């Protein structure tokens, strides 16, 4: 498949399981908690998206670029040695498949959304683009599409994340983007998002904010999900070709939750498919130094949406911690909160140490170095595989490659580069 969002997912009359209501809510989650200045821009964006999906020329251009520029469709790869590792001569353990989003142009799933939103920005006449980034992959993807279309690009990135992801900072600059360090708060993704929103409020007439996850005010959770839905739709077709049916389990890491939502969306109404999101437990959930928002969070409002958040007893947003810059966020997309509440999706958390061990294992067994974010999903196989039988099929969203994380992993392992 080379296409974008399938036609059956554009219909506003879909079940509320797979679509927010007219107020932009998934159950009680979501909404628009933003300054009045931004409401017209959000209305304009939602309307532009609705019109674009109905426009054959928009879909044709997006499909063409997804195929020739991004490199879609991405393969569904059978991880035979990883499968053998977890079976260990027993009848337990599933067959493991990887949805190779790491093979996209720029090395992650992020470009699916960045490309789609850039085309919408052009459609709306907005030539100045801003974005937030944590691990740098969304920043690189945004800078890439801005270079492709000749758009001004400003990326907000926490100073701590710039230190951890120096390679991606230079990549963004090489692509012509202005990378603006954020020093407030923990100098990570939450603070970068806050600065991007402040910029947008000031420059809303000329600027489009390419938000990088299924978070933020409506219509962003829906919009970002829709641009990533191609992941799950390809997976559904590829599974039927590979083993004749839908998978038993879908597994993906969750920070804000865009890669997981892109994989899950096509399967939400198929109750035979388990959907599992894996959060960052950091130093351990019990230590308080983690980013396990769904596991430990409470309902609150952050960055324009109501969702589960990490909060202290007074309701103040707490600092998140993860070795992975892309998961180091104290909130989560509202649709994930909703899927958890209604019992449709499951969520677990793994530690920094477990993620690094999984990254090394996958690298040595499959010759694929996953991103630290993705490594959290791989790490959960240790607990999941012994519970699944030999005939089970599991698909992991390999959301990004780990080149950007080599220095961080080397430092953690005590190696010098």
From Swiss-Prot:
Catalytic activity: (1S,2R)-1-C-(indol-3-yl)glycerol 3-phosphate + L-serine = D-glyceraldehyde 3-phosphate + L-tryptophan + H2O
Superkingdom of the organism of origin: Bacteria
SUPFAM superfamilies reported in the protein's UniProt record: Tryptophan synthase beta subunit-like PLP-dependent enzymes (SSF53686)
InterPro entries recorded: Trp_synth_b_CS, Trp_synth_beta, Trp_synth_beta/beta-like, TrpB-like_PALP, TrpB-like_PALP_sf
Residues bearing the modification N6-(pyridoxal phosphate)lysine: 110
PROSITE patterns the record matches: TRP_SYNTHASE_BETA (PS00168)
Keywords in alphabetical order: Amino-acid biosynthesis, Aromatic amino acid biosynthesis, Lyase, Pyridoxal phosphate, Tryptophan biosynthesis
Pathway: Amino-acid biosynthesis; L-tryptophan biosynthesis; L-tryptophan from chorismate: step 5/5
GO cellular component: cytoplasm
MF (Gene Ontology): tryptophan synthase activity
E.C. code: 4.2.1.20
Function: The beta subunit is responsible for the synthesis of L-tryptophan from indole and L-serine.
Assembly with partners or alone: Tetramer of two alpha and two beta chains.
Designated name of the protein: Tryptophan synthase beta chain
Organism: Prochlorococcus marinus (strain NATL2A)
């Amino acid at each position: 498949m080379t296409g974008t969002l399938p036609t059956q997912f554009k219909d506003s009359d879909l079940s509320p399981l797979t679509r927010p209501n007219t107020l932009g809510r998934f159950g009680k989650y979501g909404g628009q908690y933003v300054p009045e200045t931004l409401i017209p821009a959000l209305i304009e964006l939602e309307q532009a998206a609705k019109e674009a999906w109905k426009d054959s020329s928009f879909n044709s251009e997006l499909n063409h670029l997804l195929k020739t520029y991004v490199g879609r469709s991405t393969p569904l790869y059978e991880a035979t040695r990883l499968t053998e590792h977890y079976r260990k001569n027993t009848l337990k353990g599933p067959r493991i498949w990887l949805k190779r989003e790491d093979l996209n142009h720029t090395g992650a799933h992020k470009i699916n959304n960045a490309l789609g939103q850039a085309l919408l920005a052009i459609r709306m006449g907005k030539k100045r683009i801003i974005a937030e980034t944590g691990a740098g992959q969304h920043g690189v993807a945004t800078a890439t599409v801005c270079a492709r279309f000749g758009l001004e690009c400003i990326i907000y990135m926490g100073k701590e994340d710039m230190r951890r992801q120096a390679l991606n900072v230079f990549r963004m600059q090489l692509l012509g983007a202005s990378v603006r360090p954020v020093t407030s708060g923990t100098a990570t993704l939450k603070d970068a998002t806050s600065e991007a929103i402040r910029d947008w409020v000031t420059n809303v007439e000329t600027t489009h904010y390419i938000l990088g996850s299924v978070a933020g005010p409506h219509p962003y959770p829906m919009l970002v999900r829709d641009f990533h839905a191609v992941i799950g739709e390809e997976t559904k077709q590829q599974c039927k070709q590979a083993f004749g049916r839908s998978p038993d389990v879908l597994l993906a890491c969750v920070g804000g939750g865009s890669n997981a939502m892109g994989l899950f969306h096509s399967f939400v109404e198929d109750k035979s498919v388990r959907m599992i999101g894996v959060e960052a437990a950091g130093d351990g959930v019990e230590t308080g130094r983690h980013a396990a928002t769904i596991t430990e969070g409470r309902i609150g409002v952050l960055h324009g949406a109501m969702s589960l958040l990490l909060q202290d007893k007074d309701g103040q947003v707490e600092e998140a911690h993860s070795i992975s810059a892309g998961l180091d966020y104290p909130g989560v997309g509202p649709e994930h909160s909703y899927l958890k509440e209604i019992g449709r999706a499951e969520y677990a958390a793994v530690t920094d140490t477990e993620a690094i061990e999984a990254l090394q294992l996958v690298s040595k067994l499959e010759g694929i170095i996953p991103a630290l974010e993705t490594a959290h999903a791989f790490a959960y196989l240790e607990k999941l595989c012994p519970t699944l039988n030999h005939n089970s099929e599991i698909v992991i969203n390999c959301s990004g490659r780990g080149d950007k994380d080599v220095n961080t992993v080397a430092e953690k392992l005590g190696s010098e580069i």
